[in-house]
């Protein structure tokens, strides 16, 4: 199978929106009238230190960065990215991860509350994906060295440590690493779309 067979997503219609994914540790489905028993309780979310809405600037900055991290990872991964409508706008459902029964303010798009910096970031990363074929290859990376012209042979993909050196097999098992870099070699593309 090829990369186009992979549908990649962070959030979907069943579950938290991306903003809620970084704003709530727990679901808040009380408005659904089922005693908060409906919807998945295992959300793999992190509220960045405060449950729900906050005015804490440090928390808001971290949440914005986490949303950008998710969008960049999604849009620059191989395969087909699926963005939940409204995630690029910063849409919230106030922690409700199961709005199937909500035809109300809770599930509607609030156009006046759009997160303009997030929209601009999403547009920038989308254009980057569009303009650079290495982010949407027709075949997976295989690590083979490639060379075009007289230049040095470089693998089609290289995983990097924080100091810029190539990761070794033992680095993958390190429990303390929090950062990873990747180099995509555009010369490694064999077939153009």
Predicted regions and their residues:
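A structural signal for well-ordered alpha-helical segments within the folded catalytic domains
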Residues: 65-68, 116-123, 176-177
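Active-site-proximal helices and loops of the catalytic beta/alpha 8
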Residues: 1-3, 90-128, 132-135
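Short linear interaction motif-like sites in intrinsically disordered regions of transcription factors
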Residues: 47, 109-112, 160, 173
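Short helix/loop capping segments that flank catalytic or ligand/cofactor-binding pockets
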Residues: 18-21, 93, 191-192
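Carbohydrate-binding surface patches
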Residues: 154-193
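Short, contiguous acidic/charged loop-to-helix segments that flank catalytic cores in large enzymes
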Residues: 57-62, 112-116, 169-171
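Conserved alpha/beta catalytic core and glycan-binding cleft of carbohydrate-active enzymes
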Residues: 1-85, 98-102, 133-136, 140, ...
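Conserved hydrophobic/aromatic beta-strand scaffold that supports enzyme active sites
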Residues: 73, 108, 179-183
């Amino acid at each position: 199978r090829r990369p186009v067979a992979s549908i990649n997503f962070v959030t979907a219609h069943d579950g938290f929106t991306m903003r809620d994914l970084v704003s709530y540790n727990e679901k808040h489905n009380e408005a659904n009238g089922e005693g908060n028993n409906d919807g998945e309780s295992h959300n793999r979310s992190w509220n960045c230190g405060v449950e729900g809405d906050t005015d804490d600037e440090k928390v808001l900055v971290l949440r914005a960065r986490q949303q950008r991290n998710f969008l960049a990872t999604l849009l620059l991964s191989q395969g087909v990215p699926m963005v939940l409508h409204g995630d690029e706008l910063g849409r919230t459902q106030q922690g409700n991860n199961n709005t199937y029964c909500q035809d109300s303010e809770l599930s509607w798009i609030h156009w006046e509350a759009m997160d303009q910096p997030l929209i601009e970031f999403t547009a920038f990363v989308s254009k980057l994906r569009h303009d650079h074929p290495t982010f949407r290859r027709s075949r997976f990376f295989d690590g083979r060295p490639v060379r075009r012209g007289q230049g040095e042979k470089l693998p089609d993909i290289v995983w990097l440590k924080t100091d810029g050196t190539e990761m070794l097999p033992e680095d993958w098992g390190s429990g303390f690493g929090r950062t990873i870099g990747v180099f995509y070699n555009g010369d490694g593309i064999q077939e153009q779309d």
